[in-house]
């Protein structure tokens, strides 16, 4: 009997917050608030499983194009999330990491990101990663520049060492909520052999129960990694 696949790194594109709110006659920001609650539910579910890394697409390099009022709200929401969740992370042995080009964020937000990163550094359970001002193409360019500056040979192995996610294994399973069928410039290098799952469920409505069903399907799939 074939062994079930091992899921160590789960990545999620959390899509559908705005549409969730609009369908209910609410402002888009209300969808982001509800989406933050879903982050908490999914993170706690993963922390109680064998998953080692959960990487969430929280804010892309393209999201700056949204209305300033929405971007400002997202920054405040992120700040509130980092402060409110700190105790939860530590209590549940969850390590926090952030990836992306963080230089565009305010010094206050950077301090909050660094504070939670340092406080949770010794946690040995799930590592929750927020992709912030993240774009995969941008990440690969930055990694290549670092390789050149370090004077090392440009190779697949070396590039992986200089990516934002150098601390984590490649993605095993990638889920996108919201009904669209695209990767949106997310973890393109790391997801080369990831199993992809797309669901019409909007992120605020996504549950640990639905994720559990997808994980069972993942475990049954045959991962060939280019072989037969």
Curated annotation (Swiss-Prot):
The active site is at 15, 63 (proton acceptor). Its EC number is 2.5.1.-. It holds the Pfam family Prenyltransf. GO terms for cellular component: cytosol. It comes from the Bacteria. Its cofactor is Mg(2+). GO terms for biological process: polyprenol biosynthetic process. Mg(2+) binds at residues 15, 195. Signal peptide: none annotated. Binds 2 magnesium ions per subunit. InterPro entries: UPP_synth-like, UPP_synth-like_CS, UPP_synth-like_sf. Homodimer. Belongs to the UPP synthase family. Catalyzes the condensation of isopentenyl diphosphate (IPP) with allylic pyrophosphates generating different type of terpenoids. PANTHER family: DEHYDRODOLICHYL DIPHOSPHATE SYNTHASE 2, DEHYDRODOLICHYL DIPHOSPHATE SYNTHASE FAMILY MEMBER. This is Isoprenyl transferase. The gene is uppS.
């Amino acid at each position: 009997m074939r062994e079930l696949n091992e899921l160590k790194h789960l990545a999620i594109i959390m899509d559908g917050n705005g549409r969730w709110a609009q369908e209910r006659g609410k402002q888009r920001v209300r969808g982001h608030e509800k989406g933050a609650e879903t982050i908490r539910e999914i993170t706690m579910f993963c922390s109680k499983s064998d998953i080692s890394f959960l990487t969430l697409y929280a804010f892309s390099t393209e999201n700056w194009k949204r209305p300033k009022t929405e971007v400002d709200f997202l920054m405040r929401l992120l700040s509130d999330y980092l402060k409110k969740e700190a105790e939860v992370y530590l209590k549940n042995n969850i390590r926090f990491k952030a990836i992306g080009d963080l230089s565009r964020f305010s010094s206050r937000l950077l301090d909050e990101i660094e504070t939670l990163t340092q406080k949770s550094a010794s946690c040995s359970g799930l590592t929750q990663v927020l992709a912030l001002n993240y774009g995969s193409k941008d990440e690969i360019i930055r990694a290549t520049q670092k390789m050149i500056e370090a004077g090392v040979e440009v190779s697949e192995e070396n590039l992986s060492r200089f990516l934002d996610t150098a601390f984590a294994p490649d993605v095993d399973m990638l889920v996108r909520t919201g009904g669209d069928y695209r990767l949106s410039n997310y973890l393109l290098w790391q997801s080369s052999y990831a199993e992809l799952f797309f669901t019409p469920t909007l992120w605020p409505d996504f549950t640990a129960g639905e994720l559990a069903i997808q994980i069972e399907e993942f475990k049954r799939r045959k991962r060939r990694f280019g072989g037969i």
